[in-house]
From Swiss-Prot:
Keyword line: Antiport, Endoplasmic reticulum, Ion transport, Membrane, Mitochondrion, Nucleus, Transcription, Transcription regulation, Transit peptide, Transmembrane, Transmembrane helix, Transport, Zinc, Zinc transport
Protein name: Proton-coupled zinc antiporter SLC30A9, mitochondrial
A GO molecular function held by the record: zinc ion transmembrane transporter activity
Principal location: mitochondrion
Length: 569
């Protein structure tokens, strides 16, 4: 058998790279003709040749071996042709030589392989698709309006509520135009530096005259409408604060006169109490005036928190000035009691103070009840959560003032009856303790408000259901709705959009006949990529339009919602 195998190999004139060792399983003396047919299959793969006995447990049952080879050919692009060839089985070694001499019968089998779009590597920085507004192009790249007229203009959705769309330019086009105008990046940098220095010098000259500076800003349109802070003091919390300032100022003046005339420690505490109330209410008026100012670039969400800040400082002031001085004067009265003069005038002033403080208290209570009813909350809950910090301070201060007048009058009466000045000193300590409790409550409630407090759960549920009832929304997650003060709410949520509904919304605006014609014209992967990129970008724009629509719907149905952030999940 071996000579026949060698002859067959020589006749075929093929270079065999290797010939595996043969392990005869029977001796030559005992080899029968049937046993000598043990070597039946020859497997050829490239330059590797191997002879496998038919009695091998894995291959002995095979009647033939298939030879697979692949030829990569360009058909269009990205396709491969897979050719499958059949190799017949050989009964003898002589048959091997004859078959090797004869040409193999090939039955090619064409298999189409999917074309895969090659992934693009954009790198860590890619700005070729960035857009830039005309104002930024002129300021940052030192261009003129005439330079921008030569560039491609693109209309995009506006991020502002007052305009539907605006014009932008490709940043790469603007950069190329700036290099064309200025010649090099170094020349552009020098020009920007010169312009910045000239602008600084120009502004410094203008600051010397405030009237010219205002005219300059109005001419350029850089200022927004000025807020009318005077009107806030004629209604709502501002009106309550102004009434309290006037009444407490008069009470403070008369109480100090009574203290100077009588020398009473309780009257001194009441005078200090009225003085601290007047100062704190002046601070509240400043906070109200600041809170209605128009937002600026440094404070995009406005100044509404100034009410909480002024109320917090007011609470600290009550503790330091009111409670501290009252305790000090009461302790000094206990350690060094002084004789008290006639208390008739003191009683008259306390009576007048009780009436005036009570009137202010009623004004504050009515204002808080009206606001609580508008919010759908109970009076107690509205006060405890400090929804209206300025009016809340007035309410607590006037409540403490009324109770303080009662405490002072009681202790002064005991002193008049018994002649013991210790009762008057105890009254001073009682008023100081009352002021300390009020200040602690104000500090706590306003600190909670400044940390960021959620709105009512019922209101959050209503906003969430409004989004979930929209067909384009699958689910809402991570909802956060915080109170910004002055009845303003900020709403944030993660939205899981239904891609099919968004895509259908886009398709409803398209011409199906034209799209079908475009699909039929697609023949190559490049044309398919262009088709998909075109409509994919439009679908993304449709998704952005859906976000804008939902935000406008939320603000329209809930006027208290001023800022909406919907994140696509």
């Amino acid at each position: 058998m071996l000579p026949g195998l060698a002859a067959a190999a020589a006749a075929h004139r093929c270079s065999w790279s290797s010939l595996c060792r043969l392990r005869p399983r029977c001796r030559a003396a005992a080899c029968n003709p049937s046993d000598c047919q043990e070597w039946q299959n020859l497997v050829t793969f490239g330059s590797f040749s191997n002879m496998v006995p038919c009695s091998h447990p894995y291959i002995g049952t095979l009647s033939q071996v298939k030879l697979y080879s692949t030829d990569v050919q360009k058909e269009g692009q990205g396709s491969q042709t897979l050719r499958v060839e059949k190799v017949p089985s050989f009964e003898t070694a002589e048959g091997i030589g004859a078959e090797l001499k004869a040409p193999l019968k090939q039955e090619p089998l064409q298999v189409r392989v999917k074309a895969v779009l090659k992934k693009r590597e954009y790198g860590s920085k890619y700005t070729q698709n960035n857009f830039i507004t005309g104002v930024r192009a002129i300021n940052e790249f030192c261009l003129k309006s005439s330079d921008l007229e030569q560039l491609r203009k693109i209309r995009r959705r506006s991020p502002h509520e007052d305009t539907e769309s605006f014009t932008v330019y490709l940043r790469s086009d603007v950069e190329a135009k700036s290099l064309e105008v200025w010649g090099s990046p170094e020349a552009l940098a020098r020009e920007k530096k010169l312009r910045k220095e000239a602008e600084i010098e120009y502004r410094e000259r203008l600051f010397r005259n405030q009237k010219i500076l205002r005219e300059y800003r109005d001419f350029l349109g850089n200022t927004k409408p000025r807020s009318r802070t005077a009107s806030v003091f004629f209604k709502g919390p501002g009106k309550v604060v102004m009434v309290a300032i006037c009444i407490n100022g008069l009470n403070c003046f008369f109480k100090f006169l009574a203290w100077i005339y009588t020398g009473s420690a309780s009257m001194f505490s009441e005078a200090i109490h009225s003085l601290s109330d007047t100062c704190n209410q002046g601070l509240l008026a400043l906070g109200i005036s600041k809170s209605v100012q128009t937002p600026d670039p440094s404070h995009p969400y406005g100044f509404s928190n100034m009410r909480y800040i002024s109320s917090l400082i007011s609470g600290v002031g009550i503790f330091m000035m009111g409670a501290g001085l009252s305790w000090y004067h009461g302790v000094m009265g206990l350690l060094h009691p002084q004789p008290i003069e006639s208390l008739l005038w003191a009683y008259c002033i306390l009576a007048g103070s009780l009436v005036s403080e009570g009137a202010t208290l009623l004004v504050a209570v009515n204002e808080l009840r009206r606001n609580a009813r508008a919010k759908g909350m109970s009076f107690y809950k509205y006060v405890m959560e400090s929804r209206d910090p300025s009016t809340n301070v007035i309410l607590l201060e006037d409540t403490a003032a009324v109770l303080g007048v009662i405490i002072a009058a009681t202790c002064m009466g005991l002193t008049s009856i018994t002649g013991n000045p210790l009762y008057d000193s105890l009254g001073s300590l009682g008023v100081g303790t009352l002021l300390g409790m009020v200040s602690a409550f104000l500090i706590y409630t306003n600190t909670e408000a400044l940390l960021g407090r959620s709105i009512q759960p019922e209101q959050v549920q209503r906003l969430t259901e409004l989004l979930e009832n929209d067909p384009s929304v699958r689910a809402i997650h991570d909802v956060k709705a915080t109170d910004l003060g002055l009845g303003k709410v900020r709403f944030k949520a993660e939205v899981d959009f239904d891609g099919r509904v968004v895509t259908r919304s886009y398709l409803e605006k398209q011409d199906f006949d034209q799209m079908l014609q475009e699909i039929q014209e697609v023949k190559t992967p490049e044309e398919l990529e262009t088709f998909m990129l075109k409509h994919g970008e439009n679908i993304i724009d449709t998704l952005g339009a859906e976000v804008d629509r939902l935000e406008k719907e939320l603000k329209k149905r809930n006027p208290e919602v001023r800022h909406v952030d919907l994140e696509i999940l």
